[in-house]
């Protein structure tokens, strides 16, 4: 997540328009799809440790390379590698979380996602601060090396608790089996893509929107992103306190509507106010992104938990298969959002799309009924 506050610089280095940058960025989903088709089976066959180490190395190297690029075609290739690495790492980590959740006998995935979001916010704050003082190449290179070493240390500490390689003889499992064993849970997949697009759109566009539309300087442009993910931390870490009083189904049904309406309303208001009061426009920007983040916070971990419960396959495989569908749909939706911003000349108009998708989750809330 360290490169998110640097998106305006990466976009400038590559000399791309909003539509081009958004499209090329979303092509990382192609690499993600390839990784998701196979990573779940690799975790099941080889264990979580090996997958995490290889994915972490590839992820850190690809981000470090991106910081130096000025060629759009090379960026596309490296971004696909980055997408594949992140997906493989994510699948192994979520499978490990399901393993711990099954042993604990309670829903802990939301809290794990909350801790992940804490890391994302800390990284964004640090990176936003570094924007003013350090060049992108030095910043990302040093951070990538440090992060990889930290990940290795954590993996070493967690090794006794990690998912071990399967003892079953699955040597006959071939390339064709990746597709024949594929299962789609249409309702959960639809709910997931609609529920996470506010989060993804915030990561992709909030910094660019604050800088180019609202007109705030570098470090202030990262604040909408930071506040959004701070709100998500509160939502994810606090979910277990609310659930005894309000069912997950009701949380999703009402929260998605409030979040979607608030997200669209305040972002559009900020766009209308920018010519009259930059301060008021900036405040509306902060509120809009934060509302969207808070009320969409529990959706991703909840829907992954629902998918795992509704499937008889190993958790790593379920996460991978869900991820494939999600990555394909994400690529399509991100591309639509990017070119809506390009052709309309307004990122605020483009943000209506993820806002409406969040509202639509209310009609799919029954997937959480039995959790």
Identify the meaning behind each predicted range:
Residues 310-345, 349, 354:
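A late C-terminal transmembrane helix in Major Facilitator Superfamily
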Residues 87-103, 297-311:
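Intracellular juxtamembrane helix-capping segments at the cytosolic ends
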Residues 138-156, 349-366:
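Symmetry-related core transmembrane helices of the 12-TM Major Facilitator Superfamily/SLC fold
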Residues 15, 47, 68-73, 215, ...:
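Helix-breaking motifs and short loop linkers at transmembrane-helix boundaries and internal kinks
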Residues 35-48, 131, 235-248, 274, ...:
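Helix-to-loop junctions at the C-terminal end of transmembrane segments
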Residues 34-73:
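Conserved MFS/SLC helix-loop-helix module at the cytosolic interface between two early adjacent transmembrane helices
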Residues 249-303:
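C-terminal transmembrane helical hairpin of 12-TM major facilitator-type secondary transporters
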Residues 4-19, 204-220, 342:
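Short amphipathic helix-loop junctions that connect adjacent transmembrane helices
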């Amino acid at each position: 997540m360290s490169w998110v506050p640097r998106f305006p610089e990466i976009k400038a280095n590559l000399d791309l328009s909003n539509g081009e940058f958004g499209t090329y960025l979303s092509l990382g989903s192609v690499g993600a799809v390839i990784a998701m088709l196979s990573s779940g089976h690799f975790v099941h066959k080889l264990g979580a440790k090996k997958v995490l180490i290889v994915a972490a190395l590839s992820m850190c190297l690809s981000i470090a390379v991106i910081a130096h690029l000025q060629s759009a075609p090379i960026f596309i290739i490296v971004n696909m590698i980055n997408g594949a690495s992140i997906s493989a790492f994510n699948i192994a980590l979520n499978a490990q979380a399901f393993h711990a959740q099954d042993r604990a006998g309670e829903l802990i995935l939301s809290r794990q996602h909350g801790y992940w979001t804490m890391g994302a916010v800390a990284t964004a704050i640090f990176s936003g601060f570094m924007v003013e003082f350090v060049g992108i190449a030095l910043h990302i290179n040093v951070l990538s090396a440090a992060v990889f070493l930290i990940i290795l240390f954590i993996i070493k500490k967690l090794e006794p608790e990690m998912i071990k390689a399967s003892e079953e003889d699955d040597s006959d499992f071939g390339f064709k089996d990746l597709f024949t064993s594929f299962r789609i849970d249409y309702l959960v997949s639809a709910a997931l893509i609609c529920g996470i697009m506010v989060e993804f759109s915030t990561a992709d566009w909030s910094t660019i929107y604050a800088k180019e539309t609202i007109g705030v300087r570098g470090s202030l442009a990262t604040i909408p992103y930071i506040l959004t993910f701070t709100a998500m931390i509160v939502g994810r870490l606090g979910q277990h306190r609310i659930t005894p009083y309000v069912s997950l189904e009701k949380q999703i049904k009402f929260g998605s509507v409030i979040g979607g309406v608030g997200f669209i309303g305040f972002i559009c208001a900020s766009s209308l106010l920018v010519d009259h009061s930059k301060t008021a426009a900036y405040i509306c920007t902060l509120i809009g992104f934060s509302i969207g983040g808070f009320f969409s916070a529990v959706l991703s971990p909840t829907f992954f938990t629902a998918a795992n419960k509704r499937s008889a396959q190993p958790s790593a495989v379920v996460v991978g298969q869900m991820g494939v569908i999600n990555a394909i749909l994400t690529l399509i939706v991100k591309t639509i959002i990017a070119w809506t911003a390009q052709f309309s000349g307004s990122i605020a108009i483009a943000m209506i799309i993820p806002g409406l998708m969040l509202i639509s989750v209310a009609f799919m809330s029954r997937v959480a009924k039995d959790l």
